[in-house]
A protein has these predicted regions:
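Contiguous interface-forming segments/domains that mediate binding rather than catalysis
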Residues: 1-109
């Protein structure tokens, strides 16, 4: 039985959160990954931007793990017919030391 989009995304988001935390400097307590689909839509790769509001001058490039996770997200979205044009994926460290994440999608209406 095929997994739902939410089940696919849940697994991918966990991989992506771990990869994003690993890619950022240890002094960052939050990070944002912006993914933008090309004008032709999903399937042709995504533009990636990683940033921190606390450290706007720091430069972080996507690792292989981030690229693999975002490609998996793109392919899962295509497989389930979920056409989005932009995704902002945020991770933040809680006072307990644990990391939480949230993903927000922009879709054409």
């Amino acid at each position: 039985m095929e997994q739902s989009l939410q089940e696919d995304q849940s697994l991918i988001f966990r991989r992506l959160a771990d990869a994003l935390v690993e890619a950022t400097p240890e002094w960052w307590s939050a990070a944002e990954l912006e993914l933008v689909a090309p004008p032709a839509g999903l399937g042709g790769g995504l533009a990636h931007t990683i940033s921190s509001g606390e450290y706007p001058r720091d430069i972080v490039v996507p690792t292989d793990e981030i690229m693999e996770a975002t490609r998996a997200l793109e392919l899962a979205s295509l497989r389930h017919g979920d056409a989005w044009r932009r995704c902002v994926f945020r991770v933040a460290q809680e006072p307990s030391g644990h990391w939480c994440f949230v993903a927000e999608f922009e879709r054409d209406t």
